């Protein structure tokens, strides 16, 4: 089967947005797509070139891409981006690139990228260098999702030499990026120094690595399939929490895998093996009456009533106090929304608007002073005939985790607690 025929056999959709750098790989991808329109007239193609501004020749590259796209009659978008270099130039450029693509992609378009067989080898070895498990060693797949977009990599079966030979046969030229010779970057070091030696020794090295990556991917999928019943039993999607009632009965390997599935579902960075062990020891299996927490980057993993919660880092808002005035809005601290006092015919209503939720508390009309604050320690009575009890017991009755209790607006009338908005009123 020819390169073109094998490429066309993979096309299952009609609309593609092609990531086009102007290099040999993406030029081959663009040319194969353009050629495929001859017997697939339904194909609708667009290309996008990201102008990073990192190379002195960046403007020339954009002009080259425009010329190639005009020749192949493919509409081109050229998008200039600014790179956040805090996470490194490579990662910053990658994030800026995909953000721009996401901005321009139509809802029904598949993003096509030009990763080929040798790219797969490099990705596998970089994952190996990081100590990745089978998920990382699965490297790249023909179809996946990335940054919330469907990604299509139809060149993975083909080698770079095969793609360049195709371009020569089509009389198409391409850009040579001089930064590819900079061996300070890990991928370039592998490409320029290590892999040529391995390929001289083992001519089918790239194909063998590709097979290993596929085996890892399939094993990872199988593990997920086998774990899914236990995961779905314990995972609550509404608040992204994970139940621990059955956890102690699982093997250590299953415990690790389920927690990794949970963190993946929550879209947070995966902890190292030692961190995961610490999470299980210090949080999952902490004393029943403890309120443990584990810091994971910008998130905090907490446990309450035998469930794991994932929260951001919260600021201390217990010193906040503001007076409420009718028809005036109070902005609450730490992005906790706003509170508005409304005067009705028979009463006053404190309306708390937070994210997509709205809660209220009612009070009788009067000349009293009404204020809002956070955090309260003491006893409360919810009904006239009730005994006073510690507010901690009331929060427990409503299953409110300790870290949320100081983030719920409390309404005070003449200095006395009258309501935890949206939860309970105090007699």
From Swiss-Prot:
The keyword Signal does not apply. Its EC number is 6.3.4.19. HAMAP family: tRNA_Ile_lys_synt. One of its GO terms (biological process) is tRNA modification. InterPro entries: Lysidine-tRNA-synth_C, Rossmann-like_a/b/a_fold, TilS/TtcA_N, tRNA_Ile_lys_synt, tRNA_Ile_lys_synt_N, tRNA_Ile_lys_synt_subst-bd. The N-terminal region contains the highly conserved SGGXDS motif, predicted to be a P-loop motif involved in ATP binding. Belongs to the tRNA(Ile)-lysidine synthase family. It is found in: Cytoplasm. This is tRNA(Ile)-lysidine synthase. GO terms for cellular component: cytoplasm. Keywords: ATP-binding, Cytoplasm, Ligase, Nucleotide-binding, tRNA processing. ATP binds at residues 21-26. Ligates lysine onto the cytidine present at position 34 of the AUA codon-specific tRNA(Ile) that contains the anticodon CAU, in an ATP-dependent manner. Cytidine is converted to lysidine, thus changing the amino acid specificity of the tRNA from methionine to isoleucine. GO terms for molecular function: ATP binding; tRNA(Ile)-lysidine synthase activity. It comes from Actinobacillus succinogenes (strain ATCC 55618 / DSM 22257 / CCUG 43843 / 130Z). Signal peptide: none annotated. It catalyses: cytidine(34) in tRNA(Ile2) + L-lysine + ATP = lysidine(34) in tRNA(Ile2) + AMP + diphosphate + H(+). CDD domains: TilS_N (cd01992). The keyword Glycoprotein does not apply. It comes from the Bacteria.
């Amino acid at each position: 089967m020819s390169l073109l025929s094998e490429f066309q056999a993979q096309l299952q959709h009609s609309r593609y947005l092609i990531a086009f750098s102007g290099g040999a790989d993406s030029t081959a991808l663009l040319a194969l797509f353009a050629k495929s329109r001859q017997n697939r007239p339904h194909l609708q193609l667009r290309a996008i070139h990201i102008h990073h501004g990192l190379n002195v020749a960046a403007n020339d590259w954009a002009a080259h891409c425009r010329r190639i796209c005009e020749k192949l009659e493919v509409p081109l978008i050229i998008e200039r981006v600014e790179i956040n270099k805090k996470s490194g130039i490579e990662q910053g450029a990658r994030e800026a690139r995909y953000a721009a693509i996401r901005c321009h992609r139509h809802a029904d378009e598949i993003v096509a990228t030009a990763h080929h067989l040798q790219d797969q080898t490099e990705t596998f070895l970089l994952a190996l260098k990081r100590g990745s498990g089978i998920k990382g060693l699965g490297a790249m797949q023909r179809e996946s999702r990335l940054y919330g977009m469907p990604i299509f990599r139809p060149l993975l079966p083909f080698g770079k030499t095969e793609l360049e030979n195709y371009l020569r046969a089509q009389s198409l030229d391409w850009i040579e990026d001089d930064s590819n010779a900079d061996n300070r970057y890990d991928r370039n070091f592998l490409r320029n120094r290590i892999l040529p030696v391995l390929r001289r020794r083992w001519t089918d090295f790239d194909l063998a690595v590709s097979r290993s990556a596929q085996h890892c991917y399939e094993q990872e999928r199988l593990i997920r399939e086998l774990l899914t019943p236990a995961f779905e039993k314990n995972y609550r999607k509404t608040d992204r929490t994970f139940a621990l009632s059955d956890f102690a009965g699982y093997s250590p390997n299953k415990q690790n895998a389920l927690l990794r599935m949970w963190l993946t579902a929550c879209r947070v960075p995966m902890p190292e093996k030692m961190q995961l062990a610490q999470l299980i020891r210090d949080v999952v299996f902490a004393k029943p009456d403890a309120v443990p927490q584990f810091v994971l980057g910008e998130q905090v993993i907490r446990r309450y009533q035998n469930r794991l919660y994932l929260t951001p880092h919260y600021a201390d808002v217990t010193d906040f106090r503001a007076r409420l005035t009718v028809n005036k809005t109070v902005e609450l601290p730490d992005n906790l929304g706003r509170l508005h006092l409304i005067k009705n015919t028979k009463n006053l209503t404190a309306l708390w608007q937070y994210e997509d939720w709205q809660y209220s508390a009612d009070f009788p009309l009067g000349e009293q002073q009404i204020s809002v604050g956070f955090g309260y320690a003491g006893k409360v009575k919810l009904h006239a005939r009730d005994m006073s009890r510690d507010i901690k017991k009331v929060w427990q009755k409503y299953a409110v985790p300790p870290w949320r209790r100081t983030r719920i607006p409390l309404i005070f009338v003449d200095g006395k607690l009258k309501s935890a908005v949206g939860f309970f009123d105090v007699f």
